[in-house]
Amino acid sequence: LDGKLARPPERPGLLHNYRKTGRLPPIYLMFIECSAVISTRLTLICHARTVAQKLARFPTNEPVENQPLKLGALATQFANASLLLCGPELRTRQTAEWFGAAPQVDAALRDCDWGRWHGQAIKDLQVHEADALQAWISDPQAAPHGGESVMQLGERVARWLTSLQGMPGHIVAITHPFVVRAALMQVMQGAAFNAVDVEPLSVVELRFNGIWRLRLPGIDLAGAL
């Protein structure tokens, strides 16, 4: 129902029967139950491109590469959002400022902890730590870099999603590719983590109305997201 209630069909005698028996028909109970569900809209936005992404390196706390020319146009995209969140890193805070003046930092949106691989090029790891890299790619519980495993990241993101379920309104969160992927895996209940690519400034929208659902926005031909 996407947060909207249709009017149940009128049938003669229903109210009379309710007054007599104290019971509502199942269709009325369904509408009452739907109206009690809090509707949460969550828009996840990946931070803008960084030099590390271009060079296929694990990230450091680096800035975004370029600033868009039309900042005003970006700010209007989610002007009516009830809450603007971002991860604590410089790149997420910079990107969040394009969409609103006062983003709120949420530590749960931080990037995966890459341990000693921070700043390391993947091509170098393929030479010097090939077995460790392969273990990390193939096993979500593996953390050969000494940081956070993919499974631990997923558990963190799952707790964060649960915390949002009682928050009505539209929440916009600027975060990292791996956090977005982990959120999608929680919603889809799938194991295809490595089959999802999250491009810089890509937008993913999730909605909670009893259960989390992935919503793929259409393209606005007038130029909006």
Task: Give the residues covered by each predicted segment.
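Domain-level recognition of soluble alpha/beta enzyme cores
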Residues: 69-71, 190-215
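Phosphate-coordination/substrate-recognition cap region in phosphate-metabolizing enzymes
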Residues: 72-128
